[in-house]
Amino acid sequence: MLRGKATVAAAQPRRTFVLAGMLSLGQLVIGREARLADAMARGDLHNKNEDYQAKQLQELEARLQGLRNTRPSAPRYEGHVPLWWHEKALLFGISGLRSFFHPENGMNIVQLGEAAAIPCFLESLRRTMLSDATGRRILREQPNISEPDLDMDKLAQLPTNTLGHTFYRWLRKEGVTPDTRAPVTYIDDPVHAYIFKRYRQCHDFYHAITGLPIIIEGEIAVKALEAANIGVPMAALGALLAPLRLRAAQRERLRNIYLPWAIETGLSAKPLINVYWEELLEHDVDQLRAELGIRVPPDLRLIRQEQLQRRRSFKMKYESFEN
């Protein structure tokens, strides 16, 4: 009798627990069904409510309008983000520090370039283009440099001594593409924005026609060439400050070979911003270099390999002498 009472008493808590669990599960299911029903009634599911999309568009436009109200002006071209002067100063400072410590992150370089592209520099570049017939045509036609526009398959079939094949070969060797160039975002004037976009897109042609790779020393040399030739502020900053983080052997190569070459070539060459590269793809690359006043520097990769081999050979001789 006592055992039976004890069994009944022990079973009651278990039944209570099971009933409570079933009740909670039922509330969860019923509550979920109720929420689904409410969502369907509002048109949140399957867009059954005809006003749903219109409401969503209104909410999106309201958010965008709220964002526009915080900007100093309305956007003046696709992708334009107007900044206040203090935001530009902050962008310059932060992107400058990030570019110095993390030059491998291309977005840091992109933001620093636009932050440093002050209007007086861009206006000077515009006057340079307006003073030249080809430059004026570039401003008028505003061509775009991309793989589809250039027809890379066609460039691959061109004779090896042409600019087009040289450009194609350099892109494939370095594993890059002109399509990776970021759009201009923070420059306010639409004409200035296109000029900076053009400068940015032509950067790979400067590499290809000089044969300089995209390793850090090659980038610094091309930046120094750009600074001397067209006066790009960010390029000048890069040429001056970037070598500070390099090893002694790298700084020595830049100081003795590539920076003197870049400054001399940049100052003596024709303004590269006025070159309509897309129309010269079938031209002989050596003849084009002569016309532009560009002298090819020593092969950077080859010099690096030769110097590395000499250091290794010297180290082996020293170690054998020690033993």
From Swiss-Prot:
Reaction(s) this enzyme catalyzes, per UniProt: a 4-hydroxy-3-methoxy-5-(all-trans-polyprenyl)benzoate + H(+) = a 2-methoxy-6-(all-trans-polyprenyl)phenol + CO2
Note from the entry: This protein may be expected to contain an N-terminal transit peptide but none has been predicted.
For this protein, the Enzyme Commission number is 4.1.1.130
**Subcellular location(s) of the protein:** Mitochondrion inner membrane
Q: What is this protein called?
A: Ubiquinone biosynthesis protein COQ4, mitochondrial
Q: Name what cofactor the protein needs.
A: Zn(2+)
A biological process (GO) of this protein is: ubiquinone biosynthetic process
Read off the InterPro entries from this record: Coq4, Coq4_euk
Write down the species: Eremothecium gossypii (strain ATCC 10895 / CBS 109.51 / FGSC 9923 / NRRL Y-1056)
Q: What GO CC terms are in its UniProt record? A: extrinsic component of mitochondrial inner membrane; mitochondrion
Q: How does it sit in the membrane?
A: Peripheral membrane protein
Q: How does it assemble?
A: Component of a multi-subunit COQ enzyme complex, composed of at least COQ3, COQ4, COQ5, COQ6, COQ7 and COQ9.
Role description:
Lyase that catalyzes the C1-decarboxylation of 4-hydroxy-3-methoxy-5-(all-trans-polyprenyl)benzoic acid into 2-methoxy-6-(all-trans-polyprenyl)phenol during ubiquinone biosynthesis.
Family in the record = Belongs to the COQ4 family.
Q: Give the binding site residues for Zn(2+).
A: 203-204, 207, 219
Q: PANTHER family given for it?
A: UBIQUINONE BIOSYNTHESIS PROTEIN, UBIQUINONE BIOSYNTHESIS PROTEIN COQ4 HOMOLOG, MITOCHONDRIAL
Keywords, ordered alphabetically = Lyase, Membrane, Metal-binding, Mitochondrion, Mitochondrion inner membrane, Ubiquinone biosynthesis, Zinc
- Pathway terms, separated by semicolons: Cofactor biosynthesis; ubiquinone biosynthesis
